Amino acid sequence: MKNFYLLVFIVLQSILFNSCSSSNAVVSHGSDLSKYKYVVFGKESTGDRELDDMIMLIENEIAKRFQVVSTQKCLELLSFGELILAPSINVKSEKGEGGHTYITIKFHDYGTSQSIAVIKSSGIGLTVSHDQKIALNAIRKKLDKILK
């Protein structure tokens, strides 16, 4: 029985140490993300086409925080002096033993093309889907933090 508890302890410990995330955000000096109300999505996404579902999940997270507009509507909003964010999303997932999932979102001002913020996260778990969930949760937390 003692060996059983030792085995359970070792398995739980290995799971805890094998699942981790990291994230980082850098906001351009003088930029105030609270001034932005709108976001436009386009063809700015890169990465493995097999990860389009992850890109859609990230777009959904961004859309929860801004009003999504079309590129045609952007021109009208810009003429009224509105600020619009345009994100570039990159997702990469290493397959195999000890793989990682990396997410990078670069926000730029649609009107000026100036870089506003870069958010990065990574996740490592027991499976590829676990890696992705960990990285997505890290991105959610970082978005919440910088888009208050």
Identify the meaning behind each predicted range.
Residues I10, H29-G30, C74-E76:
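Short, flexible, glycine/charge-rich loop motifs used to bind or transfer phosphoryl groups or to couple energy/partner
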Residues K64, V69, C74-L126, H130:
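Surface-exposed short loop/turn segments
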Residues S21-L33, E59, Q114-K148:
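C-terminal/domain-edge helix-coil "capping" segments
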Residues M1-C20:
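Sec-dependent bacterial lipoprotein signal peptides
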Residues S14, H108, I146:
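Mid-sequence acidic-hydrophobic segments that form the walls
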Residues L16-F66, K148:
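A structural "domain/chain start" motif
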Residues D53, L57, H100-Y102, I134:
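Generic recognition of short, well-ordered alpha-helical segments
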